[in-house]
Regions:
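A short, N-terminal "cap"/entry segment at the start of jelly-roll beta-barrel domains
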Residues: 1-39, 121-124
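Glycine- and acidic-residue-biased ligand/ion/polar-headgroup-sensing regions
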Residues: 60-62, 66-71, 76
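Short acidic-glycine-tyrosine-enriched beta hairpin
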Residues: 77-92
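Conserved GNAT-family N-acetyltransferase fold
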Residues: 45, 64, 88
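Well-ordered beta-strand scaffold positions
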Residues: 45, 70, 78-80
Length: 124
């Protein structure tokens, strides 16, 4: 495991489509992964206009930091309109979803804890 890591341009990191049932227009870039740190990961996620990650839950905690664009998150049974500068923490096993409701890309940094069970349970 390296002592440090520098990414000069996070937009240049390989993008992977979010591969869960019902996800559309969501792309993930792993900035810090298990090879860098066994405790948590840092990801940049880009959600295209109209794109979404459906209602789902997982055993790991997740924090969303909104950098650009606007969206709507469902967390448990509440709905939050998100915009740049906001931070949303989602506890383990808390149902949540995110959708881009704007006309530009929704860009968020997500931090997730690594747990024994990293599976995602889609609820819709």
């Amino acid at each position: 495991m390296p002592n440090y890591k520098v990414i000069n341009d996070i937009t240049s990191v390989k993008q992977e489509p979010l591969n869960i049932r019902g996800a559309t227009g969501v792309y993930t870039q792993w900035l810090v992964d298990k090879g860098d740190n066994p405790k948590y990961a840092v990801r940049r996620q880009v959600i295209k206009p109209g794109g979404k990650a459906p209602l789902h839950k997982h055993a790991y905690a997740e924090t969303f930091i909104v950098l650009r664009g606007v969206g709507k998150m469902t967390v448990d049974k509440g709905v939050i309109e998100i915009k740049p500068g906001m931070c949303v923490f989602v506890s383990p096993n808390m149902p949540h979803s995110i959708v881009n409701i704007g006309s530009e890309d929704l860009e968020v940094i997500t931090v997730i804890s690594y747990e024994e069970d990293m599976s995602i349970n889609v609820l819709e």
